[in-house]
Regions:
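Structural microenvironment flanking redox-active thiols in thiol-disulfide oxidoreductases
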Residues: 2-64
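Thiol-/selenol-based redox modules, centered on thioredoxin-like
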Residues: 77-139
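Short, charged low-complexity intrinsically disordered segments located at boundaries
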Residues: 35-38, 67-74, 91-98
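Structural micro-motif
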Residues: 49-51, 62, 69-74, 83-90
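Generic preference for well-ordered secondary structure
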Residues: 21-24, 45-49, 76, 80, ...
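Sec/Tat-exported extracytoplasmic proteins
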Residues: 11-15, 44, 65-73, 132-139
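Solvent-exposed, non-transmembrane alpha-helical starts
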Residues: 1-2, 81
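Alpha-helix boundary/interfacial micro-motifs
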Residues: 11, 43-45, 74, 105, ...
Length: 139
């Protein structure tokens, strides 16, 4: 849920642009049907036509997460909800490439923390906003 709250911040900043979009992939496709996801988007008051809540075959979703984006997600009956994930955002450019940056030591930062909130370090959200601005030539 924190991820979607933070994604709403990004949607509020960029959601009216034709050159920006958000894809949220469920990792619980057995419960998150297209109808359920539509109701959820209404519940959290998504206004942008460019924010898509996506579901599909469980194996395909987990393969996309783990192998395509290289972002961990897994079924885990021992945790609340029965699944776990890293809570990262990936920034994909218009050509389909995952964008990244380097830290002060030259180490690549490929993903952005999406589970931060106002009571924690918001560095991941601030970094993705900066990088979106660069991609959209806003700064």
């Amino acid at each position: 849920i924190e991820m979607n709250k933070n994604m709403k911040i990004l949607d509020g900043l960029y959601g009216d642009r034709d050159d920006f979009g958000i894809a949220s992939f469920t990792i619980d496709p057995e419960n998150d049907t297209p109808t359920t996801l539509k109701k959820y988007s209404e519940l959290i008051e998504v206004k942008s036509k460019n924010w898509h809540f996506l579901t599909g075959d469980k194996k395909d979703i987990y393969d996309l997460s783990n192998k395509g984006f290289n972002i961990f997600s897994s079924i885990n009956e021992a945790v609340e909800g029965g699944f776990e994930h890293q809570g990262f955002f990936a920034l994909i450019d218009k050509d389909g490439y995952i964008r990244s940056r380097v830290n002060d030591y030259g180490t690549p930062i490929v993903y952005y923390s999406g589970i931060t909130n106002e009571n924690e370090d918001v560095q991941g959200i601030e970094m993705i906003k900066e990088d979106i601005d660069k991609l959209l030539n806003l700064k």
